[in-house]
Amino acid sequence: MSEYSLFTSESVSEGHPDKIADQVSDAILDAILAEDPEARVACETLVKTGMVLVAGEVRTNAWVDIEEIARGVIREIGYNSSDMGFDWESCAVMNAIGKQSADIAVGVDEAGEHEQGAGDQGLMFGFATNETDVLMPAPITYAHRLVQRQAEVRKNGTLDFLRPDAKSQVTFRYDENGKPCAIDAVVLSTQHSASVKQADLREAVMEEIIKPVLPAEWLSKETKYFINPTGQFIIGGPVGDCGLTGRKIIVDTYGGMARHGGGAFSGKDPSKVDRSAAYAGRYVAKNIVAAGLADKCEIQISYAIGVAEPTSISINTFGTGKVSDAVISQLVREHFELRPAGLIKMLDLKRPIYLPTAAYGHFGREGENFTWEKTDKADALRKAAGL
């Protein structure tokens, strides 16, 4: 038997408590950016039974109705009945947003000859791999697609007994060349109404969610399926668990296959390099892989608060590079702008584009607003590398 290794990633649905919080934070960010593209926003959300608490720091002259925004997000997700214990109409919405410190603005804002500095110190990673069509790791890609499908069949009425809270997990087998060759295990847990029998639920999830999403060539008689393995899952959402912004940073990125600098994304305007530089890192890594310079690429970028130039840029292609990592690193410096103001302009980030990122991953997504997914630098990189 040939040698193989296993790798697992998980995702959660838009109705998971932590993801509700992420979406509320990003909806508020979008509403502010729509009125004031120069706003500074750091918006955190907590959700629990019957309540939403929004807190953080904002600097803007714009006014937005935070209560209305939060209720709208919860309604769209599908918490629309008091039977679920969480309802967009009856939940309390509390606002504890304050002003951003003027000390931060001194180092971060552009003023005359002073170039915009990083909003904080920190390290960020970007990653890409050619094992899927979206140049993302297979486990996180299919984990996301499972919970996206759960939301789709819940909302369109195909499986009307499903409720918003759900989680998925996919374990892939990788061959001796490091390529995905089979799916070893699939876990899908979904909240549901009390009326459905477990046997009916499991059959419906298998036929309407798992089979349409996972490629048949990766499934076999050896694939293990765990559908609601603990039995019934009636109590869920913010009733079952408290939700907080920024607690699903591995779901948001690469499913654990790449390293993470620790900074969350949602609720942060693009002056925060936690978010914008991680997006730029993805853009760099994806273009390197799309150009054929490597099968797999991870970039680390780091910053000092108030300083524009990155304190470091490093590249790792895990031995898959067609040219050396040092050559790729030099190409990155020549072809990409990684100072805060430059990368914000490069990716056009001062726009209300963030709510769609707050569920089902920030990377490997399609749509013109996911500017960091473009591969428009691939040809220039390929030519510059002499490939």
From Swiss-Prot:
UniProt GO MF annotations: ATP binding; magnesium ion binding; methionine adenosyltransferase activity
SS bond list: none
Gene3D superfamilies to which the protein is assigned, alphabetical: 3.30.300.10
Subcellular location: Cytoplasm
E.C. numbers: 2.5.1.6
PROSITE patterns: ADOMET_SYNTHASE_1 (PS00376), ADOMET_SYNTHASE_2 (PS00377)
Biological process annotations from GO: one-carbon metabolic process; S-adenosylmethionine biosynthetic process
Pathway the protein acts in: Amino-acid biosynthesis; S-adenosyl-L-methionine biosynthesis; S-adenosyl-L-methionine from L-methionine: step 1/1
Cofactor: Mg(2+); K(+)
Binding annotation for ATP: 16, 165-167, 241, 247-248, 264, 268
Residues the record lists as binding L-methionine: 57, 100, 241, 272
Residues annotated to bind Mg(2+): 18
Binding-site residues for K(+), renumbered to this chain: 44
Cofactor note (record): Binds 2 divalent ions per subunit. Binds 1 potassium ion per subunit.
Region of interest (Flexible loop), ranges: 100-110
Catalytic activity: L-methionine + ATP + H2O = S-adenosyl-L-methionine + phosphate + diphosphate
GO cellular component: cytoplasm
InterPro entries cross-referenced by the UniProt entry: ADOMET_SYNTHASE_CS, S-AdoMet_synt_C, S-AdoMet_synt_central, S-AdoMet_synt_N, S-AdoMet_synthetase, S-AdoMet_synthetase_sfam
Major localisation: cytoplasm
Keywords of the record: ATP-binding, Cytoplasm, Magnesium, Metal-binding, Nucleotide-binding, One-carbon metabolism, Potassium, Transferase
PANTHER family associated with the record: S-ADENOSYLMETHIONINE SYNTHETASE (PTHR11964)
Family: Belongs to the AdoMet synthase family.
SUBUNIT field: Homotetramer; dimer of dimers.
Function: Catalyzes the formation of S-adenosylmethionine (AdoMet) from methionine and ATP. The overall synthetic reaction is composed of two sequential steps, AdoMet formation and the subsequent tripolyphosphate hydrolysis which occurs prior to release of AdoMet from the enzyme.
Protein name: S-adenosylmethionine synthase
Species: Marinomonas sp. (strain MWYL1)
